[in-house]
Amino acid sequence: VVVYYKFGENPKITNLSAGIFAKFKAVFNIMAERYLAKLFVKAVKTPFSLQWFGKSLINNKELKEADIIHLHWVNHGFLSPKFLAELDLLDKPIVWTFHDSNAFTGGCHVRYSCENFHRQCGNCPLLKFDGKNDISHKNWLSKQKAYSELNFHIVAPSNWMANSVKESSLLGLRDTTVIPNTIEIDVFKPYVKAEAKKI
């Protein structure tokens, strides 16, 4: 497993930000993404990623030696659309599991009732300065360019997510497979409501 910024000491997890300079750059990217977003996004609880910063991974040893690349979370300064598209140069099969809506919107992670992702985003209700060519539309265009250069298969953990992908103007034509998240059925199992409240 390769991560952008590592928490903990698990030896099976490779940190892409090992070393003082790489760590500083990762923290800078993460903080810059968050603070710049505050300039453009209304004071709401809905997360919005600009994805202006990123890291090139095409020279990474682990990725070069990998049989397959499985992406999960690529935001907070990790993979901007430009660096995401570069992964195609590694000539590896790529699978991307979506855990929220960001990959197929102009920046929001949770779209609630907004349906602008059906038509190239723009006029984003989350932005302070919205309009037809606002940041959400520009982000959408960056993602469209990147996705046109990158071959990947989408995994959705729910039918709802798969249907959302199919409805999106960015990825509606991509193959999507539903693979539900796994859970410990010994721990998470149906209980009688009254009994569950006692636990």
Question: What does each model-identified segment do?
Answer:
Residues 58-79, 92-99:
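Short N-terminal targeting/anchoring amphipathic segment
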Residues 73-78, 98-109, 124-132, 162:
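A short, histidine- and acid-enriched strand-loop-helix "catalytic/donor-clamping" loop
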Residues 85, 89, 102, 114-155, ...:
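Membrane-proximal helix-turn-helix segments that form the acceptor-binding/catalytic region
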Residues 160, 182:
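Carbohydrate-associated surface elements
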